[in-house]
Amino acid sequence: MYPENYEKFEKIIERLREFKGVIIVEGKRDEDSLRKLGVQTEILRLSRSSLADVALLASEHEEVMILTDFDETGEKLAKRLYDLLVGLTKVDMETRRELQFIASKDAKGIEDLYDLWESLRLRFWAPKEGD
């Protein structure tokens, strides 16, 4: 990842930390990764309930962010969730698209974001010897 993409990645991570709605992820490792990144908002896991149940719970919030993995299954889940939620609440798919564009070569999904962030932070922003 190039330094300019790292800066974009950092801005997305900051947006995740500041997000006030509910975030939908696929599983526990995805949630754990987001928590390590400092995300404190409510997170719903698809592994805990049916797609329809998660969509129903999410629709009770003013804004929903869909963060499924970047593989084919994640794409299909994101589309199905969007179709269920659009018109019921504000749905953020853009953050997932941005993450996919910037990080998909280095991360297969949401569960990899913390490790990617940590390695990039050390690579691009670690103090140089003598500082």
UniProtKB/Swiss-Prot annotation:
Toprim domain location: 20-103
Cofactor: Mg(2+)
Residues the record lists as binding Mg(2+) 2: 69, 71
Gene3D superfamilies reported for this sequence: 3.40.1360.10
Protein keywords: Magnesium, Metal-binding
Pfam family, one: Toprim
Keyword Metal-binding appears in the UniProt entry: yes
Taxonomy, superkingdom: Archaea
SMART domains for the chain: TOPRIM (SM00493)
Cofactor note: Binds two Mg(2+) per subunit.
PROSITE patterns registered for this protein in UniProt: TOPRIM
Residues the record lists as binding Mg(2+) 1: 26, 69
MF annotations from Gene Ontology: metal ion binding
Family: Belongs to the UPF0292 family.
PANTHER family membership: UPF0292 PROTEIN MJ1624, UPF0292 PROTEIN TK1411
Protein name: UPF0292 protein PF1724
UniProt source species: Pyrococcus furiosus (strain ATCC 43587 / DSM 3638 / JCM 8422 / Vc1)
Phylogenetic lineage: Archaea, Methanobacteriati, Methanobacteriota, Thermococci, Thermococcales
